[in-house]
Each structure stands twice: as structure tokens, then as C-alpha cells.
Amino acid sequence: AGDAVLVSLAKLLRYSLRDIDLPARLGGEEFAVLLPGEGAEGAIILAERLRSAVEQDAVAFGGKHLNYTSSFGVISLPAQGTAGKLDAQVAKNVALLKSRENTDVADILYSLVDAALYQAKETGRNRCMPVDLANLADQIST
């Protein structure tokens, strides 16, 4: 059944994303989609649209139709050329995380969005959970 779901999901992504968007399977049942030039609001709208489409999808397997759901963590950075306009608190929070985790910004963003994904799963599944870079106090204090 898992392979049938992956095939169906790949088709759904192909028809739902722009040509410049980049979906990637991270492993198992985890995927990432890079949305160049898309802001936080657009990313959340797309994640919700994908979540709804997955919820309505059914996969034929073993003579039955199987439904499945999805959960999303969503994170966004400013578009290229506007990074200098990052709110001072966001920049401070990201710098603090970088110094604590001794890693680069991409790894920090992945850690934050992965935590949001698991929060979405823990709070009922089949939902989208955005990361608010301006309010990282919870992630920094732990």
C-alpha cells in the first residue's frame, strides 16, 4: 500500500506545484517542498491546499480504496533581496540557535520545521503547523 500512496502523492504534487517548486522525499514518509520566492502566507496556503487534496485522495490497493492524511510543518524566509529587512528579533533568535547548535542556517530551519511537523502530528494529525521565526522563545529556551 505504501508504494501506491507514494505514486499517488507524486502525481498530486506534480499537479499542485509550480514548475519552479522543488519537492523532495527526505526518507520514509517525509517530504519537503522548496517554494522559491514564496512568502510565509503563500507557503501556508499551499500546504493547506496539499493537505486537503491528500485527505480527499484514495488509493486503490488489494481491491479496496485506502484514504490517507498528511501533516505539514511550514517555514519561510524572506524573498531574496529582502533578507536585510529581517526583524531584529528574528535575526537574533536565528543567530542564537546557530551558536547553540553549531550548525548552519539551513540545518536550523530544517530542525525548526521538523519540530513543527511533529507538533502537527502530536496535536491531532492532518494539519499544517507554521514556524513563526519572530517568536522562537520556546525553541531557544529548551
Residue ranges of model-derived segments:
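Glycine-rich helix-loop "coupling/hinge" segments at transmembrane-helix boundaries
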Residues: 1, 62-64
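Conserved long alpha-helical elements within nucleotide-processing catalytic cores of c-di-GMP signaling
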Residues: 1-15, 24-28, 32-33, 40-48, ...
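Short helix/loop segment flanking the catalytic signature motif in cyclic-nucleotide metabolism enzymes
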Residues: 5, 32-52, 65, 70, ...
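Short, cationic motifs built from Arg/Lys/His that form the positively charged side of catalytic pockets
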Residues: 12, 18, 25, 49-51, ...
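Conserved amphipathic alpha-helical interaction elements at protein-protein interfaces in regulatory
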Residues: 15, 19, 37, 52, ...
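A short pre-motif secondary-structure segment
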Residues: 22-25, 66
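A general secondary-structure junction signal
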Residues: 27, 63, 70-78, 130-135
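Catalytic-core segments of nucleotide cyclases and related cyclic-nucleotide turnover enzymes
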Residues: 40, 44, 77-142
